[in-house]
Amino acid sequence: MILIAIEEAIARYKGIVVNRHADMISSLSSGMTNIIKDILKISIIIVSYSWLVENISLYKIEQLWVVVLCALVVQDFTGYWLHRLNHRVNIFWNRHVIHHSSEEFNLSCALRQSISQTFNYAAILMIPAAVFGIPAYIFAILGPIHLFMQFWYHTRLIDKLGILEYILVTPSHHRVHHAINPEYIDKNYSQIFIVWDKLFGTFQEELSEVKPVYGTLTPASTWNPIIINFKHLWQLLKDSWNTKNLIDKLRIWFMPTGWRPDDVKLKYPIEKILNPYDQKKYNPYNPRNFVIFSWIEYFVASAMMFHLFILFDNQTMNLNYLYGAYIFVYIFIYSSILDNKKSFKIYGLIKLFLFSSILLYQNVSWFGLSFEMTILFGSYILLSSLIPIFINK
């Protein structure tokens, strides 16, 4: 949040608009859902790296610096191919579409991380590291560092960086990656070292005469990060069901991203951007009171997330899942309000009903809060549930 605030301050000083309130709330909320999913361990590991090391290791590198260097190279190489697969195959795109859904390019959009990565198969691409006996704990330490090193280059404020452009992934390289211009699309998959794109033919330099246009060719058209996470999957399911071609029912999942059977493409057309330079950013009308209310709700959801972290080891996993699910619903509701659709007025009542049900289930105690704090929090939930009914458009 500090770095995002610094980026916003510098942008304002330079007279550049890099953030929109609704877009930022959507991005930060997406990051929150990803964190909750991770701590609840809602994923299936196809094969673990620890198992690979224990069963196929043929040699053990002794020098620590060599181990760390090899691990970094393997992590980055694996990241390149996972990233490329996520872009190029229909079923895998659903795991990554949330990250590209913003029509802005800023530090907050880096937090748009997936909750739809149900199956984890990354270890399969790390077999060379397992053969050489690189310990699993090295990747456990290196993984978060490697991920954080991908945060800084999601910005429009940093120009090209001289000699570093030939070595590292820079903001310029990653602007290309997030762009939907014909010159840029499906380029620059590298995560730390740009060498992989140059080696495998997917590198594209940012051109001074081609300004990047950000987003996806099939626009998200919502601020709700949970809907965005599963929108592509829902489209695949519908197309697989609706097509009359039995082969297409199966192959749609493994075809290039965006491919649809001919019969459903004609019968059920979907919105696509044919000319990026004519892009009209998703921007439903949001009065100031909508925005203020959604920011308050975001911070309340953040407080609940931290409360869940504090409680995590002191309550049953069933209660952890229940609390996590409620926070997901909470995020779904306040982010939907920013879409300004007629249905948003009933969302507050749903939130109130779920809160009341959980409260009764826990004998009028909100996940370990004192009676007084439960009453205080419940009063806020009641008030915030009624606000959408009376809030003016």
Regions found by a protein language model. Give the residues of each.
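Juxtamembrane "helix exit" motif at the C-terminal ends of alpha-helical transmembrane segments
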Residues: K41-K60, I124-F139, G143, V300-L319, ...
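Substrate-recognition/cap regions that form aromatic- and gly/pro-loop-enriched pockets
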Residues: N283-L369, M373-I391
